[in-house]
From Swiss-Prot:
It catalyses: uroporphyrinogen III + 4 H(+) = coproporphyrinogen III + 4 CO2. Pfam families: URO-D. Substrate binds at residues 27-31, 77, 153, 208, 326. It is found in: Cytoplasm. The lineage of its organism: Bacteria, Pseudomonadati, Pseudomonadota, Betaproteobacteria, Neisseriales. Its EC number is 4.1.1.37. Belongs to the uroporphyrinogen decarboxylase family. Its main location: cytoplasm. Gene3D superfamilies: 3.20.20.210. This is Uroporphyrinogen decarboxylase.
């Protein structure tokens, strides 16, 4: 494999000295970029884009051509795993992801099993192809949804505002939900390990919906299964550590519990104070975040002010990867994203070295 020319992102995740704070953006390859829209149109549909190795590589690289980012993230979707389980993923115009066969009956849940990873070969092919295209420029991040977040879509049959169906199952038939979650955890472990084998140099677990749970439920139905995954992941590849990032949106209440599961870093959403988070768990884990995606809709001056505030809140030393507190909004101005990236690099140097 090619030598990594910029390993700042990996070093920051392991709290090793860096010259500046690295930055990447969740959903950095996406609809806010006109070049992404053009490639997506060429692919025909979102799923076709995910499954086309050449085009998935193209859209992964696009933001790196535009911005001085310190990592690339695989272009894919968290729902590839339940799709491989045979639930029939499709995207309804204006409604987001849907499943033809939602898991709402005991018989269907009993039949659920870890999918053959060959069904997800298109993802691993994309990882290998992207690594080749990157040619050591920056590290490549692989990812998956968390068992609970995947279960939300699998049980609800799509996205939801109140999660009534899955919460009803959780409180009335927890045994059924635990069966789904355990299957998901085994599948995600195999999926991420296969991404690492294909060339992913760090992995992130997205727990997008963990924050809708009560304190006790989060620990029993979400964190327990993320811990199971982290324990089963390959942590060494190509002679270096493969860092694991866990991002639970709305998870600021549970940082101490999350810091104990063996991950290298925790992602923070924009509602957390990063300085306070560092005081709470900074000895155990690196932190990633946590610029409000909608702060990109401000002025260039307000973007710079917000970057300066977050960097100052975190303070001196390594262990911070700058990111948004959630995915970049599709209506964001790419020029403002560029200001964000360049400002982080410019203003963060004073917090490192010396």
């Amino acid at each position: 494999m090619t030598l990594l020319k910029n390993d700042t992102f990996l070093r920051a995740l392991l709290k090793q000295p860096v010259e500046y704070t690295p930055i990447w953006m969740m959903r950095q390859a996406g609809r806010y970029l006109p070049e992404y829209k053009a490639t997506r149109a060429k692919a025909g549909s979102f799923l076709d884009l995910c499954k086309n190795t050449e085009l998935a590589t193209e859209v992964t690289i696009q933001p790196l051509e535009r911005f001085d980012l310190d990592a690339a993230i695989l272009f894919s979707d968290i729902l590839t795993v339940p799709d491989a389980m045979g639930l029939g993923l499709y995207f309804a115009e204006g409604e987001g992801p849907k499943f033809k066969r939602a898991l709402q009956h005991e018989d269907d849940i009993a039949k659920l099993h870890v999918p053959d990873m060959e069904k997800l070969q298109y993802v691993f092919d994309a990882v290998t192809s992207i690594r080749k295209a990157l040619d050591g420029r920056v590290p490549l991040i692989g990812f998956s949804g968390s068992p609970f977040t995947l279960a939300c879509y699998m049980v609800e049959g799509g996205s939801s505002k109140e999660f009534r169906t899955i919460k009803t199952m959780m409180y009335s038939r927890p045994d059924l939900l635990h069966k789904i979650l355990d299957t998901n955890a085994q599948a995600v472990t195999a999926y991420l390990n296969a991404q690492i084998d294909a060339g992913a140099q760090a992995v992130q677990i997205f727990d997008t919906w963990g924050g809708v749970l009560s304190d006790a439920a989060f620990k029993e139905f979400s964190l327990k299964y993320i811990r199971q995954i982290v324990a089963g992941l390959k942590r060494e590849s190509e002679g270096r550590r493969v860092p694991v990032i866990v991002f639970a949106k709305g998870g600021g209440l549970w940082l101490e519990s999350m810091a104990e599961i063996g991950a290298d870093a925790l992602g923070l959403d924009w509602t957390c104070n990063i300085g306070e988070a560092r005081r709470r768990v900074g000895k155990q884990v690196a932190l990633q975040g946590n610029f409000d995606p909608f702060a990109l809709f401000g002025t260039p001056e307000s973007i710079r002010t917000e970057v300066a505030r977050i960097l100052a809140d975190y303070g001196h030393g390594s262990g911070h990867v700058f990111n948004l507190g959630h995915g970049i909004n599709q209506h964001a101005d790419p020029e403002h994203a560029k200001i964000l990236v360049d400002t982080v690099h410019e203003l963060s140097r004073q917090y490192h070295g010396g």
